[in-house]
UniProtKB/Swiss-Prot annotation:
Forms a cylinder of 14 subunits composed of two heptameric rings stacked back-to-back. Interacts with the co-chaperonin GroES. It comes from Agrobacterium fabrum (strain C58 / ATCC 33970) (Agrobacterium tumefaciens (strain C58)). This is Chaperonin GroEL. It is found in: Cytoplasm. Its EC number is 5.6.1.7. ATP binds at T30, L31, G32, P33, K51, D87, G88, T89, T90, T91, G415, D495. Belongs to the chaperonin (HSP60) family. GO terms for biological process: protein refolding. GO terms for molecular function: ATP binding; ATP-dependent protein folding chaperone; isomerase activity; unfolded protein binding. Transmembrane segments: none annotated. Keywords: ATP-binding, Chaperone, Cytoplasm, Isomerase, Nucleotide-binding.
Amino acid sequence: MAAKEVKFGRSAREKMLKGVDILADAVKVTLGPKGRNVVIDKSFGAPRITKDGVSVAKEIELEDKFENMGAQLVREVASKTNDIAGDGTTTATVLAQAIVREGAKAVAAGMNPMDLKRGIDLAVAEVVKDLQAKAKKINTSEEVAQVGTISANGERQIGLDIAEAMQRVGNEGVITVEEAKTAETELEVVEGMQFDRGYLSPYFVTNPEKMVADLEDAYILLHEKKLSNLQAMLPVLEAVVQTGKPLVIIAEDVEGEALATLVVNKLRGGLKIAAVKAPGFGDRRKAMLEDIAILTGGTVISEDLGIKLESVTLDMLGKSKKVSISKENTTIVDGAGQKSDIEGRVAQIKAQIEETTSDYDREKLQERLAKLAGGVAVIRVGGSTEVEVKEKKDRIDDALNATRAAVQEGIVPGGGVALLRSSTKITVKGVNDDQEAGINIVRKALQSLVRQIAENAGDEASIVVGKILDKNEDNYGYNAQTGEYGDLIALGIVDPVKVVRTALQNAASVASLLITTEAMIAELPKKESAMPQMPGGGMGGMDF
């Protein structure tokens, strides 16, 4: 086992604080509308330019083991906040640094670290309650756009794109962000349910120009197994022909004489039909077929349920206003399923998302949820260079996460003002002086956001804080972009409650652990041994 170095008390905390400061100072320059960029060197390719706090934090690794421990713990604050709320990483880092700094001073002055921690926890709990009480629910598309704009560092177009995407696919819909091949950023929305399987034969195409099969007002047959025997299918085919409506078959596969007969009938014009492979594999395929059945008001023909293909009637088939099938994708628009059934299925999938521990399963469940709940939107991020596209994509990801958080828990005035106001509303009392000091640490730390935003904008922080607190109005604050004061909600400068709350709770949690640290252990750096000398060449005592 390698030898370890141990540091105690003040010297340990000083080292740790130095690491916290290095990381936090690099991250906090990105805060606010006038925050600066950070350039990150990459071992291959061009350097990366970003204003995303968590991206900066993840790149920092310090040489000194003890300083690095402090930095990594604060990095954990940023990562955890990003995982839960998707934004607010810089906010969390600034708050953590402020609490650690003040806490370290209090411990150095001889206060009990455990009482300080209890005081911090009391104050944070009260601030969280105050934030939730002040939260304003989001109702309009314009408010969604405002949240997106603020998180994208004031780029209005990003906010508008996100608002439009949410309006079209619903709050539960999937919105993905991809890199575009062009210089323009564009929004593409797929309404209805789309899955990545195309027609089994190009002969099913109804529009040869676009090579798609468009079937209006169609019946949908959902079959769990392969279809190769035509005889079993005849009763259902005859019933559909009599209605004069098209039929879409979705099965594990359609092959042999079954596929050949369908193609021949389609070409002769006797039957409007198309066949598609079912999406997914294994259990996921079963679940997705069930989703399509609920969406279209049909039944999955499955041996598990004891239903045979020969006995299928028209009322077991799903219905849809339009089914569009291309070489790669199938889209079902406006299925005839009961709204209550779809809502029940959505609730069931949401419960599975809560329970699953696998990120992959969660992602797949969210895709299924979106397809049932409304659709899928794709924001394609354009730019002149690869570096610009990556930087913009970071901001759009942040803005999207912030917007989702705002829809969940509501919004409060932005620019750090909500926390600044909450600092004046902390009424809880500690049971002793040390706990009271812990409460005051939080009071002071809650000012740090407004101060940092003002500093990044080149203004005097103390004057800004003083002016905001002079007016006893919750929404009154400072617009760093213009340097003016006013009603921040009316100006569209807002923060999602979930982001602010998560940032504060995570910052306080890690900061109070750092304050209560009394010893640190790290491996001693290995001494590089000198290279052994090479033995002399040639043969001794010989002259050449």
